Amino acid sequence: MTKIAARLLAVLAGAAFLYALRVYPFGHGWPSWLFAALLPSYFLLLCWRPALWLFCLPALLPVLDLAPWTGWFFLEEIDLLLLLTVACGYWRLHQRPAAMRLSPAARLWLLLCSLAWLAALLRGLLPLPPWDANAYNNYLSSYNSLRLGKAWAWAMLLLPLLLRDAGHGGWRRYTLPGLLTGLSLVAGCALWERAAFPGLLNLSSDYRITAPFSAMHTGGAALDGYLALGLPFAVLWLVRARPRWHSAAALLLLALALHAALATFSRGLYAAMLAAATLGFVYAVKQLLAGMPAAQRTSQGSRTVLSLLLAAAVALALIAMFGGAGYRGLLAAVVLFSATFVLATHALPWRLAPASAVCALAIEGVLSMLWPGDVAGWLKGPYCLFLLSALLLTGALWPGMRPAGTVRLCLAMLAWTMLACNLAWIGWHWGGKPALPGAALAVLLAAVMLCNRRLHPPLWRLQRGSLSLAGAAAVLLALAIPVSASYYATERFATTAGDLQGRLRHWQGALDMMPADAASAAFGMGLGTFPATYYWHNRLGDVPASISHMEQAGERYVRLASPGYGAGYGELLRLLQRVSLRPDTAYLLALDVRRTGAMPVLQVRLCQRQLLYAQNCISAPLRLRPGDGLWQHYALPIASAWLGSGQWLLRLPVQLELAASGTAVSSVIDIDNLSLRAADGVEQIANGQFTQAGNDWFFSSDHHHLPWHIKNLALQLYIESGWCGVLSLLGLLMLASVRLLRQRSQGHANGYANVAALAAILAFLVVGLFDSLLDVPRITLLFYLLLLGALLQPSAPSPTLCHESTPP
């Protein structure tokens, strides 16, 4: 690209940014203020260090999503950042040469993908519909093609910047930390949502977390796909961490990300995690055995098998402990096994073990008899003594002290014995006699682990790698066991066969709706056309609920269409707006309603809601008069009660919900002039007259998601892009995978990073077996950037460009 062309593109992007800034709906409280402050800060960062976009975009792509506040999901906040990135990046594109390049094969496949994308985009977009109030606020619009198509367009616009900035360690220095930052933000959002709504320990609820992904308002797997992409890089950070605080931070991030992944209750994501873990395990074993003589390789293989058997036994013991003693027993068992893992790496004075055990039992017996019985909570005997034993063991083995001598090791063995006794006591206290077998199994297995140093060589040593692996395993088991044993997870796995049959029927129905002509087979029906195709042509005769903005005599209003399903009741489509309420306050709700018959019925509620699944709702006492085709005004009191209570993070978001509920035949109801005021007269509803169409309003379909998603990545590609789209992206995937595998097999210095990238791609595709991930532009763009990073290679060998700096 010439300098003049780059500057011209920068000017166009800058002009588009200024126009988007002018029309973007600011003014939605603290989210808008944060976004308004972010834009100039990001601009200054790019002026200072142009390559910082490699950090900022991966960090902000998943979380910069204000659609539930603004109602805008065609032009998103991340689009403004991308316009700013292109404008600043292309203006300075030629200040230094590109450090990376693409192979001829990569250029060819990118060209083929671009041609397939362009054909699918035009087929979905043309003929251009009128640019009215419904053009950009629903998925039935032909302009939905632009919404889905922008991911590839952004990826191609960022490619020259990637070639310039990813080299010389730029990818490793900026992009990987950006991915980890984004993952930590998403995991934090998931943790807050889980704690705020169903509760962290409430695993029987069917509540589905969405974290910051507003695209999940009609279902889909945006969170699943993002976690599939991000988790391998969290593991990579843990594997490569050098300072202790890096290892601790990586382990904490992995724990948060694993919690978010497990709390989705997504079977597809679980399968993706298993596939990625299998790939990583195979690579680690091959690295471990590489270069060993045959005899040593056999010995190492036997030790690996023995380690796996031991890990399986520990998992079974933890499962038994959780089944008998619940969360507290599980936590105690995890602590015991962790302490045993560390203690077993020392040369224990076994000749003094009987004396240590006798002393421990005596101390434990005396303390248990003297401990007061009228205390509550963690001050109860088994819990407090367990904690004291753990602290004593930690002090005896504290790594900052000089090498452990006989006295300290005897003290550690005494503390370990007390820890084991208190574990059994916790089981008895919490679960009674049924908990004792699990506790006995855990103590016996921990005692066997203490014999680690008697093996030659031992199964593990106290090293950074073994500690990281043990910590990751402890976190995984501590999180996975309660989730897998929960009622909701059990129910999900029990219905897998039936759900798969339903998914197969949906896939067949999607294929049946596709026109049987050569052009559709080659180029697809067009990007983003599936929701409209399902609405008009599904073979079941169902009519999904819809929301549209109408205009009459210069006045705009919103029209809600109730669902019409042959089987009877259908899932409602809820029109939502976030409102700021004071608790225990009387409000007056006013609105104008028009309908022509007895149906549909209008539901008006104030609910605590993040995105999906409302809770603690207060319904407005609305009783509609018989429909006569004329506007009817209603004013009714509604009390906020508990809604709006709490401070800052403890205050759950409150949303006003409107939904049309009818019979098996779809019918419509019109709404206008919505108002919600307290005695002070301050209006709580923005755009209640709908003069700005869908601004400030969002919508959700909580349970029925099939009208919006094909639910398979490959099938989505075929239906919307045809064989050209499928084969071109398949070729690009194969090329990227082969390059990553080739670098790994050649002993590349960045081998673990290549395996992490390959595992992320694999996990994303596994999630895509059961969901369509390419209908969320921000996730699709992140996936494309990862693919492009895998295709890059150094422009020319130089002393300053080593293999380690080659993406990913």
List the predicted regions and their residue ranges.
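Alpha-helical transmembrane segments of multi-pass inner-membrane proteins
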Residues: 2-20, 38-43, 86, 107-121, ...
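Membrane helix-loop boundary segments at the extracytoplasmic
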Residues: 59, 66-67, 712-721, 752-789
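Juxtamembrane membrane-water interface segments that cap and precede transmembrane helices
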Residues: 132-141, 201-218, 368-377, 505, ...
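Extracellular ligand-binding interfaces
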Residues: 87, 592-642
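A conserved mid-to-late transmembrane alpha helix and its immediate loop/hinge
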Residues: 210, 215, 258, 542-583, ...
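Extracellular beta-strand ligand-recognition surfaces/modules
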Residues: 179, 591, 602-605, 633-679, ...
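N-terminal hydrophobic segments of proteins, predominantly signal-anchor/transmembrane helices
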Residues: 44-149, 356-371, 416-426, 764
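TM-adjacent membrane-interface loops and short helices in multi-pass inner/ER membrane proteins
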Residues: 505-551, 679-707, 711-717, 721-728
